[in-house]
Amino acid sequence: MSPATRFTVISCLVVSLITPSETSSWFDPFIEWARSSPNMTCVNNRTGTRSLATEGLISFNFYEASRTVRTYQVPKCIFMSSVSKTIMQGVDLFESLESYRRRYYSYIIVPVHASFQIFIHDLRTDLSSPTEELTSPVDKTLPNVTIWHTPSGYVIRLLDVVTPRFEECTLFPNHTVIFDMTVPCSQEVYLRQTGKHQFAIVLTFTPSFFVLNIQTAQHQHVTENDEDVILIFGDVRSIDVKAPYSKPVLTLRQSYRDDLLIVAKTSIVNATYPFIKTQDFLKGTLSGNYLDFNHVYTEFNRLVIHNLVEGLCDAPPDDRTVSMVFSYAVLARTLYHTSNVTARLEDVALRYVRLTLARTFLQQCFDVGPRYMRFPTIDGALSVLLKLIRNSRDVDGGLKLSLTFALIFGNNTDMTKERDLENALYEMKSIHRAGLVSPLSPRQRSLLYMMAYVTHHTTAFPDIRREMLAMQTSLCSPQELYNWAPHVSSAGLTMQEMFTPCSGSGRRDYSEARIAEIVQLNPLTTKTPADLYRILAHFDRSNLTNFPALSCISHLSGYVAVTLRDVTYVVSSNVMLKGTSYPVTNLAVDKTMIVTVSPAQHPCEKTEVAHATRSIPIVKNITIGNDCEYCKSAIMEYDEVNGLSNIVYLADTADLVLVTNLDNRILASSPRTRYIMMTANGTLMEITSVIIDIRQTSIFMIMLYCSLGVLLLYGLYRLLHMI
């Protein structure tokens, strides 16, 4: 029984002691007390001619008639604690019965206003505990955390790494329905501006439950007030409510393990959030095994797709928005609200990566990036796991990338090494080469999503990030948009599987009209150009601020940036930054295209005036030999009428052979199509053809070397037998 509950029982006993009989009639009581004393002997219903005041007791003296006083006493100490003071401050002894009744029904009473549901299902975690004996610790870098190596992988004790960083806070101060309480907590605030109105959803996590607070007031605030819609989910036994309310009448959903309480004014719910009263509210998350991380993550992604496709990220919170944030909160609570079992570190790490992916969407969907609940030990555990697998060729590159992504999201770039981004670059090159000739798979899109985040959200390792950005730009072709348009309508996709490299690239020139021109040719497309443009723009909310040579250019300027190792090319319709400008002359009269070249490490300087202008030389053909003089360069393809079409990055010789093979149809072939080579050293040239002269070892010589090797082995065999 909580302190507030115990005090309520005592208060009821006190009230029962001084309740008059039906025949009694008295005036208002006169209450007086003396200074503290160990005296605990009380009188009950004493009648006398004088009022009574006893040291250490509170005396209730009721004047019934002339010179007649009825006295009741209770110990003063029970009213002197902070809990009792708080409770007494929340009680209005002079409230009328009609006001009491109106106040009771002014809040949502679930049996009266809403649909209560109880979920009976088997709740169990999807984490499996290894059965091997833990005898081989491999790393003790983290304080109080041991990592063991077993045949099934690296193993840790769960609670050693998933405990969040909590700070003491006070919940529900001065609330009409709920008594305030001081608990360890962590808060996340999500803001959304729609027109003149600002909405906020505040998540407060505690060790036992979380609070989802939908703020309807015009000003944003961290603590809860009477105008908010409050949902409390988890173990709510420590929460106390004020009379005339009780937790059963506020319980909206229930399982054998957890309760969902709603505290909200009826008028606000009816006017703005009527979906809360329906049976389907939160059913997708709570009707299944919500301790199964994969189940909740799947439901979260289903809601994300609805919000993303239907443009709900720019609208006031509705059913799907609230349900999405609620499912995210369940994900976060599932991560840390667990028993201290052993688990594979890789499984725990992938859970954390998925939670991080969910956070990236919330960060994109709401206007202000919140301060997230931190898991300091799990960040350290991820860095240790990354250290253990960093140089292993037997570990999937996607796992290495996922760990790097999660660390950079948590501002832990110092826990990563250059080798980690080199591993990401290796994966990028593989996807880039495949993506030039075939549609990207959902897994490739998911990896590209994390690569794009890594590229844009750290300033470390600039040379590697510039090449990663160049390859994302290369993948953002009209053919990619043609393939992506029907892909976004596929069933069962996660948020990151809907990603297109166009959102993470240096191509900022695709307008809604241009997208319409491309996708209208694909009969499988079901989304409108407006829908596609909104999805594309949703993922594309960051400026290129972490690239010094591009940081001064407006996000909405309509340009293409090609970031080679030592030089930056910007293609636009007018001069945008200081550098050497190269006008493209072979265009229709109404088209203008300028290529501006600047050193990679040169700070961006915005200007609309060309400081140095040169013409682009025309080269009839270029020959590429074994030295690969044009590797780390790019080819720009443009149409004389329609302008820029494609940028193709040439990472190595294999890319050169692939791109220049006409059978692959990577570069268009038409009388109006022209090509400009953007070289790694900053030289521009218009080319008409490319000759590949990469000399390869002849088949005869290979056969000769193989024959000599066989003869040598046979000679060694005979020699050993003779000995």
Curated annotation (Swiss-Prot):
N-glycosylated, O-glycosylated, and sialylated. Residues 24-700 are virion surface. Gene3D superfamilies: Herpesvirus glycoprotein H, C-terminal domain (2.60.40.3190). The chain crosses the membrane at residues 701-721. It is a single-pass type I membrane protein. It holds the Pfam family Herpes_glycop_H. Residues 722-723 are intravirion. It is found in: Virion membrane; Host cell membrane; Host endosome membrane. One of its GO terms (cellular component) is virion membrane. Glycans are attached at residues 39, 45, 144, 174, 270, 340, 411, 543, 621, 681. Keywords: Fusion of virus membrane with host cell membrane, Fusion of virus membrane with host membrane, Glycoprotein, Host cell membrane, Host endosome, Host membrane, Membrane, Sialic acid, Signal, Transmembrane, Transmembrane helix, Viral envelope protein, Viral penetration into host cytoplasm, Virion, Virus entry into host cell. Residues 1-23 form the signal peptide. The keyword Glycoprotein applies. Residues 197-263 are annotated as: Interaction with gL. GO terms for biological process: fusion of virus membrane with host plasma membrane; symbiont entry into host cell. Interacts with glycoprotein L (gL); this interaction is necessary for the correct processing and cell surface expression of gH. The heterodimer gH/gL seems to interact with gB trimers during fusion. The heterodimer glycoprotein H-glycoprotein L is required for the fusion of viral and plasma membranes leading to virus entry into the host cell. Following initial binding to host receptor, membrane fusion is mediated by the fusion machinery composed of gB and the heterodimer gH/gL. May also be involved in the fusion between the virion envelope and the outer nuclear membrane during virion morphogenesis. Belongs to the herpesviridae glycoprotein H family. This is Envelope glycoprotein H. It comes from Guinea pig cytomegalovirus (strain 22122) (GPCMV). The gene is gH.
